[in-house]
Amino acid sequence: MTTERHTATPFEEAAALARTGDVWLFRGSSAADRAIRAATNSPVNHVGMVIALDDLPPLLWHAELGQTIPDVWAGITHRGTQLHRLADAAGQWHHRYCQEAWTRQIDIDVTTEMEDSILHTIDELDGRTFPGTK
């Protein structure tokens, strides 16, 4: 049996390798983080998907209660589903929320149709709030 060993990758390198569809996973140790993991039976408490298009910086599509980073799509801050620069979102989740981060890279070629589909989904869902959190 072989044991796969993972090594830490500096954020700048991980962000430079980010492709549309990659998943970023975050895990913290606060009471809220532990409650989320217990309620969802998950080893992580926050997940986002990378959107990396053309010459734009990598973006992170995720949902959160926080409203401190301006949403790239809407141009305002709000709660719920949001599209942020990956550097801003991952930085906040690491530094402000004291979360560890992992990435899972997608293992397919993302087509133009797939990119168009995610942009349509973002257009439809961006800014959708969590129930009762307006």
Which stretches of residues belong to each language-model region?
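Cysteine-nucleophile amide-bond enzymes
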Residues: M1-K134
